[in-house]
């Protein structure tokens, strides 16, 4: 009743915000026990969007999140977070060029401070079966309650030893049911990244559909929300990074779509305003550090 009253009076969304206005209006909050699928072809920004939501909760809202990065290392993800939070390009961070620019150093100093204060935990172990993922999540949740889990991505979750001879479709069905059970057990939203079938690229209509989920099995049935990231590489908008997020399933709201601006150089999405946003975060003034000192400070949180 209190929840309904708050919603009636316009007091925010029901669940965690993504930090992206149009997406929040569409999704209406990431709720406890829900499984949210973010699907797309390689290069459409699945990891960027999933990590960005985790950053929103941990860096900007002081909540706790656990990211299972089955593909990238914790250091790679942390560099992306650093670029996103500092508005210093990922390329200049990766090559070290950022350390030769005073403004970049100031921005990075502020971002490093915010990241150190954030409870963003990263598990970088690859080839984990779901049973191991659930045990790690339980342990981390007991240590300090989590508000969100992100799994990047479902296709890299290893089969259980007892089911390795099964069809992969059946394995993914069991994995999907297990992820839903974990979300309900911990009563937190779980974001799961997923690949789309390559066959999209050979169709005349390249806009993805829910049926394009690779080895979809029971993923469509178990998920509470399915959103698909799509960027039209043949259009001027697509080439400038404008990305369509198509919510093709939502148990508690209407389906629909919104546009986000992908800023690949900063490894982040921002609100789409009809033009290329030149969004630069104003970092708080900070004492200038030497390049060596800053690099020593930059250690990925977690990485267990």
Each model region followed by its residue ranges:
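Cytosolic-facing regulatory segments adjacent to core modules
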Residues: 25, 56-145, 159, 258-261, ...
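The Walker A/P-loop phosphate-binding site
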Residues: 1-88, 103, 109-110, 296, ...
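C-terminal regions of RecA-like/P-loop NTPase motor modules
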Residues: 87, 129-146, 163, 177-186, ...
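Flexible beta-alpha connector loops of hexameric P-loop NTPases
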Residues: 12, 91-101, 121-127, 158-173, ...
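Core recognition of P-loop NTPase motor domains used across DNA-transaction enzymes
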Residues: 1-33, 88, 102-105, 112-123, ...
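Conserved Walker B
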Residues: 154
């Amino acid at each position: 009743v209190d929840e309904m009253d708050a919603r009636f009076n316009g007091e925010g969304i029901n669940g965690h915000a993504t930090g992206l206005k149009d997406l929040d209006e569409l999704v209406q909050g990431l709720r406890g026990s829900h499984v949210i699928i973010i699907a797309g072809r390689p290069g459409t920004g699945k990891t960027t969007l999933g990590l960005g939501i985790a950053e929103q909760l941990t860096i900007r809202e002081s909540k706790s999140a656990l990211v299972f990065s089955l593909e990238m290392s914790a250091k790679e993800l942390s560099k992306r977070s650093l670029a996103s939070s500092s508005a210093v390009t990922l390329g200049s961070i990766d090559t070290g060029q950022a350390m030769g620019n005073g403004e970049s150093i100031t921005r990075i100093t502020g971002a490093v401070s915010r990241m150190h204060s954030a409870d963003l935990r990263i598990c970088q172990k690859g080839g984990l079966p779901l049973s191991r993922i659930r045990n790690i999540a339980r342990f981390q949740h007991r240590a300090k309650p989590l508000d969100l889990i992100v799994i990047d991505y479902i296709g890299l979750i290893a089969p259980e030893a007892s089911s390795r001879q099964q069809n992969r479709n059946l394995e993914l069905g069991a994995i999907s049911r297990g992820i839903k059970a974990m979300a309900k057990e911990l009563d937190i939203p779980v974001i799961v990244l997923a690949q789309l079938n390559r066959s999209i690229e050979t169709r005349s209509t390249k806009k993805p559909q829910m049926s394009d989920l690779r080895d979809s099995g029971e993923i469509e049935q178990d998920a509470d929300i399915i959103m698909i990231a799509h960027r039209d590489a043949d259009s001027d908008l697509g080439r400038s990074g404008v990305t369509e997020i198509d919510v093709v399933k939502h148990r508690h709201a209407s389906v629909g779509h919104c546009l986000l601006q992908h800023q690949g150089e900063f490894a982040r999405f921002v609100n789409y305003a009809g033009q290329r946003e030149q969004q630069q975060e104003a970092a708080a003034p900070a004492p200038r550090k030497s390049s060596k000192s800053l690099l020593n400070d930059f250690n990925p949180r977690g990485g267990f």
